[in-house]
Amino acid sequence: MIPVSLVVVVVGGWTAVYLTDLVLKSSVYFKHSYEDWLENNGLSISPFHIRWQTAVFNRAFYSWGRRKARMLYQWFNFGMVFGVIAMFSSFFLLGKTLIQTLGQMMADSSYSSSSSSSSHSSSSSSSSSSSSSLYNEQVLQVVVPGINLPVNQLTYFFAAVLISGVVHEIGHGIAAIREQVRFNGFGIFLFIIYPGAFVDLFTTHLQLISPVQQLRIFCAGIWHNFILALLGILALILLPVILLPFYYTGVGVLITEVAEDSPAIGPRGLFVGDLVTHLQDCPVTNVQDWNECLDTITYEPQIGYCISASTLQQLSFPVRAYKRLDGSTECCNNHSLTDVCFSYRNNFNKRLHTCLPARKAVEATQVCRTNKDCKKSSSSSFCIIPSLETHTRLIKVKHPPQIDMLYVGHPLHLHYTVSITSFIPRFKFLSIDLPVVVETFVKYLISLSGALAIVNAVPCFALDGQWILNSFLDATLTSVIGDNDVKDLIGFFILLGGSILLAANVALGLWMVTAR
């Protein structure tokens, strides 16, 4: 759900701005001075939309557009080729995304029906997880602040949107000046909560130049977004090298935040500044290892621990085992915070259950799957496996020099409530959050700049793709099809198809995000 406070602030803020604008424009005393002030500052206000335009940057744009003309010519030629390829590729990408979304909807529908008909929980879980992974693999996803975009990351999101938009429009502006089109100004706007940028070009000049020149201008925006995304990927890859004088990597993951409701909180839990090196027997050297280890723990059976027969006899006590609702076995007091029910096979291969103090049972022991794994170290040892609910795991988290944390719960809860980084500061005065901030922002910049390039390339009404398509058809079909009406009709149907495809993706994407 979108936070109510966010909606109240946005609607209340825009209402206040619009009413103030309306009152000042209706005032006998302030009307002329206020309108003059708006005009002099290049401001215009309408419901849920503020626009600012200036000619202050015109000299800079003209300087960029006239510098190294030959190099810019080649640069925008590359951009033109990329733009045309991207325009046609966007059809395939949107079609693939639409098929994936429909597949996800069908998977969710079958999962709901199987749940209502009392299917086995394991099969339902696998169906749900596979459909979720299918949705997460999509190249394009609808983003709604407060639903699938955390509120605490809105700053990254909107900053990346604004920078991507500015770079996009700078591309259009420089290309236009390079093609001798008059540049009137540059501006920034705010629509509801989304920021953006624009350039004001002299339309008559734009219509007089050749279709190929128009293509260079119209493709320049998405070309610059593509290059920005590539630079972001390069920066992300080189980030460990860039930060090497101040931060090192490859020895574990550093805890940067533990949520207040995290199961990892406690006297023997995780704390900010702890360095995690292992999850069970899975070594952790970076964030990717952490995620892969948690995935392995989630989807593989619970691992066991070797315990000697003498220790088992000493720690265990008579218990009464019973079945849980999910079919697993419990043999400890439900309210116990230290004891866990373990299962094992004795020398006669009979499965038994015993309630043991978890820390004493698993501390300083090797992991195992069967008794054979334990016979290597001692002939009189057993492999005891925690008997937990279907999706619950006992995870031993190593974070030296502190004592190992024993986590009992769903691995995903650990994943979502504990924030980590691969970067460890070399000096105490350095912030552990700085690499996380830089890394997160660069990832948003890559995603949003790339998305802006893809979406704007779609031959859809009111997007760059419309003008790219029109110029492309003018450049290629004018000599083939003499009748302009036929050419325009072809363009119209392509635009209609692209618009329907994009609208379907957005509508179904919104439904998937808000209705799940």
Curated annotation (Swiss-Prot):
Transmembrane parts of this sequence: 4-24, 75-95, 96-107, 142-166, 171-183, 184-206, 226-248, 444-461, 462-473, 490-510
Molecular function GO terms recorded? metal ion binding; metalloendopeptidase activity; transcription regulator activator activity
Report the co-factor binding details: Binds 1 zinc ion per subunit.
- The answer, when asked if Protease is one of the entry's keywords, is yes
The domain of life is Eukaryota
E.C. no: 3.4.24.85
Q: Which InterPro entries match?
A: MBTPS2, PDZ_sf, Peptidase_M50
Kindly indicate whether the keyword Repeat belongs to this entry: no
Which GO annotations describe the biological process of this protein?
A: bone maturation; cholesterol metabolic process; membrane protein intracellular domain proteolysis; mitotic G2 DNA damage checkpoint signaling; positive regulation of cholesterol biosynthetic process; positive regulation of transcription by RNA polymerase II; protein maturation; regulation of response to endoplasmic reticulum stress
Cytoplasmic compartment residues:
1-3, 511-516
Residues binding Zn(2+), per UniProt: H168, H172
Q: Glycosylation positions?
A: N334
Bilayer topology annotation: Multi-pass membrane protein
| Keywords, ordered alphabetically | Cholesterol metabolism, Cytoplasm, Glycoprotein, Golgi apparatus, Hydrolase, Lipid metabolism, Membrane, Metal-binding, Metalloprotease, Protease, Steroid metabolism, Sterol metabolism, Transmembrane, Transmembrane helix, Zinc
Might you report a single GO cellular component term? Answer: cytoplasm
Q: Which family does it belong to?
A: Belongs to the peptidase M50A family.
Chain's role = Zinc metalloprotease that mediates intramembrane proteolysis of proteins such as ATF6, ATF6B, SREBF1/SREBP1 and SREBF2/SREBP2. Catalyzes the second step in the proteolytic activation of the sterol regulatory element-binding proteins (SREBPs) SREBF1/SREBP1 and SREBF2/SREBP2: cleaves SREBPs within the first transmembrane segment, thereby releasing the N-terminal segment with a portion of the transmembrane segment attached. Mature N-terminal SREBP fragments shuttle to the nucleus and activate gene transcription.
Name of the molecule in the record: Membrane-bound transcription factor site-2 protease
Organism (species)? Bos taurus (Bovine)
